[in-house]
Structure formats: structure tokens, C-alpha cells
Amino acid sequence: TNLRDVPMFYVHGGQDWPIYAKTGPLPITDEMRRLGYNGSLWMIAEAGHNTISVSTERVLDWALQQKRVAHPRRITHRAYFPPHGRAWWVEIQEIERPGWFAEVDARIEEGNRIVVACRNTTRVVLRPDPDLLNRRERIAVLLDGRVVFDDVCGGQQEIVLSRHAATWSGV
């Protein structure tokens, strides 16, 4: 998910409801570490639910060290509705099976190349980020292991990927 580029710092009081810690911040931060994301947990043994009096300085110091990733090379995005389908340079425009989320996992690789995997969608738009790709040169797009686009972007500066029957194509 896009949490890949969003650092998370959980603070939990050791005297707070222990069940919450076991179903909330503990498994969340474990999963973030498993995925290689930047997530950490600070358990304050003597604190209850309200940790602000003992955690503010450390939390602010941590927050001031974080940097926003303005141009992510990889985006994994899910949406239940097309109006919620845009994330950075990827947009889900059509959902094949309503009621189920559509998903796009797209990453920019060396050589002006984008590798994409899609689920439950029939139309995806890529808007190549000029900080990551040279839009004046050919851009290759591989979708589910097959080249579906290998050209320069048109005047719209976007690549539209559409699936008809079982075949994806790009323009």
C-alpha cells in the first residue's frame, strides 16, 4: 500500500488496555516491519492511555526528522470506487466487478520502464512522473509480464491501459 512511503510511529502506554496493544499497534508494527515499511512502536511501561505528557518531545523530534516522498517509484493502490482510484501517477478508472476493490501495483524501473500488475480493473491510467521518467523518450510498460506499451507519451502525458476480453493494451 501507499503506507510504504509514510513513516509511522506508534506510542502506547503499557498500562493502557492490554488487549488493544495486542490487536492494534503490536501486530501493525510487526506487519510493517515484515513488509519493509518504516513503522516503529514505543511502549511506555508506566503510562496509561494518555501518553502526551511523557511522549511529546520524543514524538516531535521524530516527526521533524521525517521527509515526504514526493515522487514514489512504486505505488500499490486499492479503490472500491473510481473517484477514489488516484494515487500519485496511477489512476484506476474502471472497476470490473463492483463491490470488490480494484488494485494496481506499479513500479518504475531503470531503462524508462514501468511494471504493472492489476486486479479487478479494466482501465488504468499512468501519468509518468517527469522526475522519475524521461517522457520525451520511449516508455515501456509491462502489465502482468507482457509489454502493452512501448512509445513516447502523447500530448496528454499519460498512458491509458485498457483490457478487452482477456487482453490488455496501452495507448
What role is predicted for each listed range?
Residues D30-V171:
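Alpha/beta-hydrolase-fold serine-hydrolase catalytic core, especially in secreted/extracellular enzymes
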Residues T23-L26, E57:
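A structural signal for well-ordered alpha-helical segments within the folded catalytic domains
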Residues Y10, W17-Y20, Y37, Y80:
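Sequence-level detector for tyrosine residue identity
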Residues T1-R4, R34-L35:
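Extracellular/periplasmic catalytic domains that process cell-envelope and extracellular macromolecules
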Residues L3, F9-G13:
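Short beta-strand/loop motif that positions the catalytic acidic residue
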Residues G14-T23, H49-N50:
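Acidic catalytic loop of the alpha/beta-hydrolase fold
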Residues T1, L26-P27:
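Alpha-helical scaffolding within the catalytic cores
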